[in-house]
Each structure stands twice: as structure tokens, then as C-alpha cells.
Amino acid sequence: MSNAPDPRPRPPAVKTLDHTVAAVPLLQGRVLLHEHAQHTPRPRPALDDSLSGVVMTGANADARAFQLRADVGYQGTLLIDSAVYTTYTATAEEPFMAPPDELFAAVDTSLNFQKARGATAALTPTGYIPPANSRALKGVMREANRIERADTLVSLPIDVTWLSRENIGQLIAVCDKIRHPKAVILFRQFDPLGQTKDIPANLRRLFTEVEYMSLLRTDLAALDVMAHGALCAGIGVQSSLRHAIPPDEKAQVGKRGGGPTYPHILMPQLMCFKGAEFLSKVYGNSDPATCDCEECDGRSLDRFYLSDGETRREAENHNIHTWGAWVSDMASYRAGSERKTWWRNKCAAAVDRYALENQRIGVGASPKSGFQVPAPLKAWATLPATQ
């Protein structure tokens, strides 16, 4: 038997944080990137490690997170979201996905396992909380308050109707009684914040009235809550990771008939995500919008109408550079009214550009021929900055 050393390089040991290391200071002020666990992790140079991080999301998230740490060598902020809420619905008796006779022990094991796989903080395995199901919501509160750890975020995967006029008061009251930091995930087909006019304002109210709230698996709503006092937030790398849908529903898509899928592109001047296919068509007879981010370097934004992996990665890098620059800008303003005013003015300026862009390319503001202002953006531009 040979005693010669093994010539194969060993992956570096993954550093783990004890459960007594508090989550709040490690996550404060960060806008994280939701990566999909179906893909092999890779470096993301576009991410600013001082203001961002990664949420590995999906059924294989723990293994992919470990790969990201051990194989890729990622040392930044990392959360593991196994997304149990996509298959499991919370009940009053079993709000977390675990055997009922082992609920507390199983939850603690889940949290420990996340930390062992390299997570900076741990997310509870909370099931989807259906509309107006007060007993399930209170069940989450009851079991969450049994957790004796400093490193835990209580995941709140709620139907967006919890932010309605009828339900927001109860949601705020229950969240206020959960003694750990909270991480909200909104459920609805397409954009949850576009459902009713009350939703953007009531989401702000939740984040203003309850301390240490986070909004994960979202879009530019991440920046709105950050401007209004959120602990942290997370933006999806692809459209399916910018919201969630209930376990008993299939994802609805705007495109019929199947076929290849194309990336969604963050428009820097208009502050919205638009599909590459739409951009290719809307700019078919005019000069396309361009971008000066590090990835684009002045190139046009209609170039992503391809379904290959390289084009998708380029589109993702553009998106990260774009919203990452806004996060950096926001951090330069003092938290409170100064930051809120900056954000409101930025959104208002973007709203004003829609008519100018439609006029420039000679189209009307219809879904088929031109750009329409998204309802949430319009709300962010008009709601009082003090709210």
C-alpha cells in the first residue's frame, strides 16, 4: 500500500458560522442575487461583495451552495433557500416542512445543515401561507418564537393578498410578534405588486412599521423596500425567481405555444424588465436603446434575442451591473428621508422617459407596440417619500 500523497487537489474547507453569530449585522443593507440551483454555480464578478451576496434557490440549493463555497471559492454573503414553499403549504399545526412529531428538532437540524453547507444565516423551511389563513400565519409565529438562535431568518412565503387593505393590519401585528428577522416572499402569477393599487403602499407600510424585515425572490421592489428600511432583499437572476406561485398552481407564461425562452433585460432608463423578444420587435424599425454598463459598454439592448447560454449569461451580467449600480447609489444617501427622496425622484424620472422613448421610436404606449409604465413603478414615483 503506497503512502505517497494524493496528487489531486482538495477543495478548501468551508468555513461555518456558529448559530450564536447574529444574522442582522451580516445581512444589513445588502441586495442579494437569487441564483437557481438547477445550474452549476460559477463566479459572478458583477456582484459587489460589500453590498450584495447570493441566495441559492431551489430543491438542490444546499448542494449547489456547498459547490459555490468549496469549488468556486465564493467567500461572500450566502443564503440557502430550498424553496419548500413551492411544494408544501403551511398549516397551523405544521407551519414548517418537517415530521409533526419532530417539528422543533427537525427545524433546528435544517438550520444547522444550511450553516454546514456554507450559509451566512439560516432560513426556516416555512410552507406557503395561503390567503387570509390566520391560523397558519400564527402557527409560523408560534414555532418561530421557539427557535433559540441568533442566526435565523423566519421565512414568510405569503400570498400577495396578505398585503390587501383587509389583511395588512393582521400581517403587521403577527410579524411584529416574531422575535427573529423576517424574510417575505410574495406569491402570485406574474408581478405580485401589479395586482392592485394597495399592494406597493402596504408593502412599504409593513417594512416601515416592523423592524428587521427582508424581501426575497423579487424584482426592483427590492430597492423600494431597501429605501424604506429593509434589512436586506433579493432579486432573482431570472423571471421565475422574481416571484413565487402557490404549490397547487402551474406557472402561467405570457408566451403561448412553447418554443425557446429568452432572457428578460433590465432597461436602465425605464427601470423595468422587458423580454428580449419584445425588445427585438419594438426596436425593429428604429435605433435601439443602448447601455453603458461594464458588460454592455455602449452596445444595444436588443442584442439578447438568442436562446444560447452565453447570451443568457451576458444578459444576467448586464442586469446585475445595472441594479447593482443603483444599490451602490442608494448606499451613498443617508437612510431615511434623504434615501427615500432619492428613490422617489429616480422612479419619477424613469416614468417620464416612457413617453419620450415611445415618441423617439414612433410607437404608442400599448402592450404590443410600445412601452407601458409598470404599475409598481408608477406607485413608487408618486407615493409620498415620507410613507
Question: What residues fall within each predicted segment?
Answer:
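Active-site beta->alpha loop and helix N-cap motifs at the rims of alpha/beta catalytic domains
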Residues: 2-189, 359-365
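Loop-centered beta-sheet repeat module
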Residues: 183-229
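Short helix/strand-capping turn motifs
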Residues: 226-283
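C-terminal extensions of enzymes
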Residues: 290-387
